Amino acid sequence: MISFEQPPTYGTLTQGYHEEHPAYDFACVPGTPVYAVHSGELTSDYNGRMGNIAVVKYNGRTSSYSHLQVVFPPGWYERGEVIGLCGNTGSWSTGPHVHFESDKPYTFFGI
């Protein structure tokens, strides 16, 4: 079972981390707050498949949160601060959820 000191959102874990899906998906009600799992500089992006994406970078760590309804303004955010809202954007979204991934999965996922 995975646990986070600061989860990316409060919802139901619907998809786990594995080779074909190197991320965790959390189903959530649209508009549910999405939290930074670590402090860092927030930027945003849009991708046709992943929708609105929040990206937090600091000290060699990068985490991303996809399919968001809203990404908050760029800037510095502390761990636990709201960086966006759960949504259902992008063609790969199968319903309202947050697709959370990291470039260093062992940092958050213990793998």
Task: Tell what function each PLM region has.
Residues I2, Y24, S66:
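Flexible, active-site-adjacent loop/turn segments at secondary-structure boundaries
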Residues T9-A36, H97:
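Short glycine/threonine/proline-enriched tight-turn/helix- or strand-capping micro-motif at secondary-structure
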Residues L13, G40, G80-I83:
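Residue-level preference for non-acidic, small/hydrophobic
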Residues E20, T32, R61-T62, T107:
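Short acidic/polar mixed-charge low-complexity motifs
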Residues S66-H67, R79, G110-I111:
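Catalytic Cys-His active-site segments of thiol-dependent hydrolases/isopeptidases
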Residues V71-E81:
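Acidic, glycine-anchored pre-beta loop/turn
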